[in-house]
Curated annotation (Swiss-Prot):
Belongs to the IcaD family. Keywords: Cell membrane, Membrane, Transmembrane, Transmembrane helix. Necessary for the synthesis of poly-beta-1,6-N-acetyl-D-glucosamine (PNAG, also referred to as PIA), a biofilm adhesin polysaccharide. Is required for full IcaA N-acetylglucosaminyltransferase activity. GO terms for cellular component: plasma membrane. This is Poly-beta-1,6-N-acetyl-D-glucosamine synthesis protein IcaD. InterPro entries: IcaD. It comes from Staphylococcus aureus (strain NCTC 8325 / PS 47).
Length: 101
């Protein structure tokens, strides 16, 4: 009889392009830094923090407090509408399944 031996798994050979990977990481870092800055400005606006850096960034982005608060108000209205829509959809589905049983 033939003795059992371990399976041979194919080795994965990878050659990463260093320039491409470095550019990808750099672009990703810039994007995340921008997201953090915007998040800080939004949090500063919501909690009415009057910090010099937040005000400077707000001026650089040409955004006023009222504009950000209007955006959040609109987002809240749409979130409520979507919540009500999906809640009604689930209730209708349960009601129809209950009738069929």
């Amino acid at each position: 009889m033939v003795k059992p031996r371990q399976r041979e798994y194919p080795t994965l050979k990878s050659s990463l392009n260093i320039v491409r990977e470095t550019a990808l990481i750099a672009i990703s870092c810039v994007f995340w830094i921008y997201c953090l800055v915007v998040l800080l400005v939004y949090i500063g606006t919501i909690f009415e923090i009057h910090d010099e850096s937040i005000n400077t960034i707000r001026v650089a982005l040409n955004i006023e407090n009222t504009e950000i608060l209007d955006i959040f108000e609109t987002m809240g209205i749409f979130a409520i509408i979507i919540f009500v829509f999906f809640t009604i959809s689930i209730l209708i589905q349960k009601w129809q399944r209950g009738r069929e049983s």
